[in-house]
């Protein structure tokens, strides 16, 4: 009842099967308009974009673990029962437009499903009740009013969460830890993150990693951010020392660009900036 009162568009689909093949006409026909029409052997889905609803889809263990550190609290949480109904978070986006559709972010460190987080709005849907084709069920953890946010704010939070999740995954398998955190600090500065954003990422990762002293790691971060540019060591060192693939490097950079807004620049802009920086270092500009 609360969901319908908040103008969240819910439609039913075949039980035990994702409604991805349903046409928009079918979804409109199957819209749920009153709670009395809810049936037990049906799946139920939220049509994102409708009513300015967007969702954060937490596809990896690390993004689910860290979500509360980065995403605004909201009254709308749902997902698989095995994830406690918290793997999807819904928000009302105040400035949502038709061009705000879907952004999916991966970390390709394995041959399986590598998507770690998604931001979805127009032209997409998300299952919120019923049974998946693998037998798991979808449940609500909260079914109240979604909190309000702007698209840019939510997208940045998605980027921050994705970077922190990737960093946490790698921190757990990268020794020595002190060097990993030092070079990661360099990577964040290298990609123009503010100290405040870098500090928030470090804080969350350190708290969940649990194998190092916060004071030591934060001192490293501050030292790197206070250092001259010529003294920096960042992502290239991480890639080399811990054998990251080019795919892993590209995925991580994509998330870093979301935080600073560089993801919205034309595709050639980042290469142009790199060329200018190189020329400046060579004193040719």
Language-model features: locations:
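Long, compositionally biased
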Residues: 215-249
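N-terminal nucleic-acid engagement/recognition segments and initiation subdomains in replication
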Residues: 185-204, 239-285
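Intrinsic-disorder/low-complexity linker and hinge segments
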Residues: 156-172, 262-270
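Short, hydrophobic/amphipathic alpha-helical patches that form generic packing surfaces
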Residues: 2, 6, 130, 182-191, ...
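Structural motif
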Residues: 40-42, 169-180, 192-197
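Short, mixed-charge aromatic SLiMs
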Residues: 203-218
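Alpha-helix N-cap/N′ positions at the starts of helices
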Residues: 163, 179-183
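Conserved phosphate/metal-binding and DNA-contacting active-site motifs used
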Residues: 1-165
